[in-house]
Structure formats: C-alpha cells, structure tokens
C-alpha cells in the first residue's frame, strides 16, 4: 500500500468527507490511510430537508466524499450531492465521489418502452453537483462507466474474496458457479485466478411477478464439490436460494454464496436463514444487516481496497495494478 499521511500546513492534502449512511466503513478507510475524517455536520430541518456544513477548509485539497446509496436511498444520495456541492464551493482541488454501492445501477438500460435509464441520471446528478471523478465497487454492468465523462475507477472485491477462499478451502475442491449469464465473465475470472472448474446456471425471470426468478438449468459438473456462486448483489435472495437447491440436487457437497453488496431487502434474511447455503459471504460496502441469517453471514472488509485506491489516485499511481488488471467488466 502507498502510505499517505495528512500533512499539517500548506501543500496537497487528502480530505475524507462522509455522510451518515456508513460511518464504520469511512472510519476504517480513514484508519488505513492514517488520514482523519473531516469534521462535517449533517442533520435535517423540520421538513426533512438535509442540512450540511463542513467545519474545516477544503481549499486546494483532494476531497474524497464517501457515501453508499443505501437506507433511505434518496436521502443518502442527496447528502452526497450536497457534500460535493459544498466541496466545490469551498475551492477543493479535486472531488471524487466514492460510492461503494452505486444506487440505481441496475437501471443501466431501457428494458421496455417508456422507461428511464436511472443509472445515467444518477451519474448526471453527481456530475452536475461537481464530481471530477467517481469510484465504485463491482458495478452491475460495465456500461455505467460510460455515462460519466471523466475518470471512473471501478473496483472489484475479488482480492478479498479470493483471500478468504484460499485461507479456508482447497481450490481443488471448489467449483465457481455463475448464477446467471450476466455473471459468467467475472465468475470465469475467479475460476481462472483460483484454478477451479466453472459451472453456469441458466436463470428464468418471471414476466408476471416482480423481483421473481428461478434457476432452471445447470451447465457443468458439480458432483461432490463445494460450489461457490458469485453475484454483484443479494437483494431479495429469491434467485440464489433456488440456485442452491439446484446445485445440491445435482450432487454438490456444499453451497456458498459470495456477493459484494448485501442489500438484503424484504424477505432476504429469512430466505437465506432457511436456505441450503452453508455460508453467505459479503463485503461491507453496505452497513451490516439487522441479523446474520442464523449465523450464515460472513462479512469481509472492503476498506483496504478503497483506501489503497484513494492512495493510488492521490499519488498518481495505477489503480488497475491493484487488481492485476481484472477490474474491467
């Protein structure tokens, strides 16, 4: 890692600014960089409007504004927009919007007539507020990077998942499983990096019921193997729970879910608790869930990857080198 200390007095400085969504992650990033979090006051007016003030100078500084789009998602997003605007008006040298989880990322295209492209709108809002650069982790699709006319640093959680896998399992016993066609490329990278076999599940999404899909067919041999599925996010957990059942029916010894973003909406935690998964491994791009699904959820820290990327940007070093060139999707 590139060491970046927070100098006193004149000269280029990193400023880490964060809102109310995920203070623990921001603190972990701060500790890794040995750079204190900037003093920011965030509250709400009686009518719900966000009130924000940065209580220290940002003039000439490289400002990194950390905020996952989660919880009351629109308030989280608007907090970040206000922080960006405040930094811009305070004459910051550069402003990077650090969005560990980018809201509306699934709405990256028109799936039907008269539908918006939400991901493009979010990027346009960050741009209009004054962001010079955007950083996010495991986007739903690579095309979202093209919505921004500036540097877009795409991080992947593969290094932390790979470390956890090799510390706890023998790769020879594992089959990496893509839960749908959209995750094949990334699942193949995991498979190649770890030296495991690869299997693919064909998923059918309901045309009549929202947020409902099921695993239909399996391509590949999983008999007697530990299957590890990878997806960018777990939302309602409907798809992956049916995937676990399919894999066990095909002879898998054990099934483990890997997912960068543990969104865990609605019935997700109860579904996972009653599912066939032995473990659900997620990163902490989002705050910890209300419960751990009966002890099944394992959380890994994404802070070192984000901190090292911030350090690389500040030092004008390569970001792709941190991920061995695997951070393109």
Which functions belong to the PLM regions below?
Residues 1-329:
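PRPP-associated nucleotide enzymes
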